[in-house]
Each structure stands twice: as structure tokens, then as C-alpha cells.
Amino acid sequence: MTEKKSHRGLLVISRHAESEWNLLGKWTGLTDVNLTEKGAHESTMLGELLRDIDFDGAYTSDLKRTKQTLAGIIKGKLADVTVDDKSIKHHPALNERDYGDLTGKNKWEVKDEIGEEAFNGIRRGWDYPVPGGETLKAVHGRVVPYFETEILPRLQAGESILLVAHGNSIRALMKHLEGIDECDMAEVEMPFGTLLMYYFEPDSSLPRTKQTRKIDITPPHA
């Protein structure tokens, strides 16, 4: 998928680009919406930032917006690989948080209805309940085991892996990788247009170093 491999594994994480419901300010969750035209363009810009890296494989969630972002990244990289290539895996463990009864509702209208404290609890809290949906803690409970089983062994073997997921599934993984305390999770963000790069040694289950790369975009309603 051209920094060549060294003894260190590399995990590059990207949030999907702007989706149709991001543009509208709606809680999307498991609703399978497409990228906007702007999002598709920005995904190719992300790919341009990764032309120096030779990936051994890629992972996305089961949802179209991550698959379409990966397709754009591949296009931007000018890589000789297709989105149905055997090196690419899609899995629901990486899906966005299920927002339950809030799915499809405008975030800012809900904020006006319930107040800022409850809104921030729902949006950024660690174990804040959402009627019919998931907490971030529950997302962590599915993302981390999948990472440890499917992705970590490849990183420890020195492979370079690209992961395209969602704001909350990435935040959950960041908690694990960076040892972030539960009480600090409200401050953890995964911005659009940002690439997180974690480097792994063969004997380590957690990254030793972290870098970031960014494209210059106008962020949508996260």
C-alpha cells in the first residue's frame, strides 16, 4: 500500500473525513452515511501526507464513511492497491459509539434542551449513560480486545498498519495506548484531518513514541 519497514512497528490512526451528518451536526453513531464531497477531498489530502510510508495492511470499521476515507487515502497515496484488497480488513469492533435514542438528533438542539453539563457528559463522558446506546467505556471494551488480538501482534512484528475509525472508537483506543485516566477522558479529542502515529518496539504492548501529522482544513460539526 515509502518509509521502508524498520524493526519498529508503526500504527497510523485516522478519523474518517467529514460525513453528511457531520455537516448537519447530527449524532451519527451506527447510521451508515456517506462522506461529503469535502470529506472525500480531504481524505485524499490525508493520503498525500502518507506517501513516505509503505503499509502492510489497513483496518476500518464496518461503516461506509471509514471505507470511503480509506479509499481516498489510497488515492492520495497513489498506491497500487484497491479497497477490496486482501490486506484491508473491516470490522464492527471499530465502529462508532451507538448513540441509541439520540441517533439522528441535532447535537446543538439537544444541548439547548438538556443543558451544557448533561450534554458534555453524553458527548465526552467515560461512563455516562445514553438511552438505548453505548458509553465510551463500552466502546473501549470492544475496541481494545480487537486491537490486542488482531493488530498488536503485527505491530510487534515490525509491520506498518493504517487504522481508519471514528471519533469515539479512536478516543477509546487512545486511552489504552496512552494510559489516559478515566477522569481525563473528557479532554481527549480526535480532530478531523489529524493522523496519529504510534511506534512500537517488538517487546512492547504499548507504543514507545508518538507523532502527529495534520492537513489544513475547516473542521465540521464534530
State where each predicted segment sits.
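Short glycine-enriched, charge-decorated loop/helix-capping segments at active-site entrances
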Residues: 26-34, 105-107, 136
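Non-catalytic terminal regions with compositionally biased, polar/charged low complexity
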Residues: 2-9, 59, 215-222
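GST superfamily/GST-like fold recognition
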Residues: 167-171
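Short polar catalytic/cofactor-binding loops
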Residues: 15-20
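Beta-strand elements within well-structured catalytic alpha/beta cores of enzymes
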Residues: 10-14, 59, 89, 159-165, ...
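Short catalytic helix/loop segments, enriched in acidic residues and glycine
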Residues: 29-45
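Phosphate-coordination/substrate-recognition cap region in phosphate-metabolizing enzymes
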Residues: 3-6, 44-119, 175-199
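Short glycine/proline- and acidic residue-enriched helix-loop micro-motifs
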Residues: 118-138
